[in-house]
């Protein structure tokens, strides 16, 4: 029995998220990957993903693992073998054999996400699937001030999609940076875990700070309230990218 860890990069534009949606006929990253794996192994292969990215969300460093008794390809050659079978918008960038107790989701200690905003009057056609377009004036310095209040361990219930069945909403944020590379503004968040839609809701809240609708220090009140209605709207999916999963 082998346990193989794969690092993936994908453009999520044409997929209904990472997780397989059986019986729906909807294209997913997991479905495409398992099809390629099963073709090579000549037996059904199921993968475990580090994160379930939503429809339209991208990844540069998604991680999965799978266990198989019949996997015939050495780990170092797996990317080449798989990439021949995978569509052009999904690629395996690294493969390695790992201990049997490795679990792509539960072994993770940190994840980094990036949310990209195209800040210009006219949206670039080359960025339309990878950035959220915001033509209005933004105070980026105020947004950075607001992001700094996210650092630390808090109950982030205010930044979780309503109706999500998660009891433990306490998370730790290690990094919250806004880096402007005009006309793109990138928000980087690194934490020990993220609630459903957490990064996109944080982005919407920081945009409200950038618009001057709320003050940077209001981020503290929003966190303490544990009230989703006080946070900003959920930013669109296309600006979000899973950059790295750490173990």
Swiss-Prot record:
Keywords assigned by UniProt, alphabetized: Isomerase, tRNA processing
List of catalytic residues: 54
Binding site for substrate: 113
Keyword tRNA processing: yes
One BP term from GO: tRNA pseudouridine synthesis
GO molecular function, one term: tRNA pseudouridine(38-40) synthase activity
EC code(s) of this entry: 5.4.99.12
Catalytic activity as recorded in UniProt: uridine(38/39/40) in tRNA = pseudouridine(38/39/40) in tRNA
Broadest EC class assigned to this enzyme: isomerase
UniProt-listed Gene3D superfamilies: Pseudouridine synthase I, catalytic domain, C-terminal subdomain, Pseudouridine synthase I, catalytic domain, N-terminal subdomain
Subunit relationships: Homodimer.
Family per record: Belongs to the tRNA pseudouridine synthase TruA family.
NCBIfam families in alphabetical order: hisT_truA
Name this polypeptide is given: tRNA pseudouridine synthase A
Record organism: Desulforamulus reducens (strain ATCC BAA-1160 / DSM 100696 / MI-1)
């Amino acid at each position: 029995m082998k346990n193989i860890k794969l690092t993936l990069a994908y453009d999520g534009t044409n997929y209904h998220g990472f997780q397989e949606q059986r019986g729906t006929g909807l294209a997913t990253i997991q479905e495409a990957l398992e099809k390629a794996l099963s073709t090579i192994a000549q037996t059904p292969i199921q993968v475990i993903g580090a994160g379930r990215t939503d429809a339209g969300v991208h990844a540069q460093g998604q991680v999965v693992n799978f266990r198989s008794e019949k996997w015939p390809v050495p780990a170092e050659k797996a990317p080449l073998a798989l990439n021949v079978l995978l569509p052009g918008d999904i690629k395996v960038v690294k493969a390695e054999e790992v201990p049997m107790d490795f679990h792509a989701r539960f072994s993770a200690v940190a994840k980094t996400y990036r949310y990209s905003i195209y800040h210009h009057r006219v949206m670039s056609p080359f960025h339309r699937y990878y950035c959220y377009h915001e033509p209005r004036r933004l105070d980026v310095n105020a947004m950075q001030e607001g992001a700094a209040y996210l650092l630390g361990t808090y109950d982030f219930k205010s930044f979780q999609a309503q109706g999500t069945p998660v009891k433990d909403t306490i998370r730790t944020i290690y990094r919250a940076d806004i880096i402007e590379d005009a006309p793109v503004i990138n928000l980087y968040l690194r934490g020990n875990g993220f609630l459903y839609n957490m990064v996109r809701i944080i982005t919407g809240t920081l945009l409200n700070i950038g618009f001057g609708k709320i003050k940077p220090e209001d981020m503290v009140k929003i966190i303490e309230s544990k009230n989703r209605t006080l946070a900003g709207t959920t930013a669109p999916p296309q600006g979000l990218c899973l950059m790295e999963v750490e173990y």
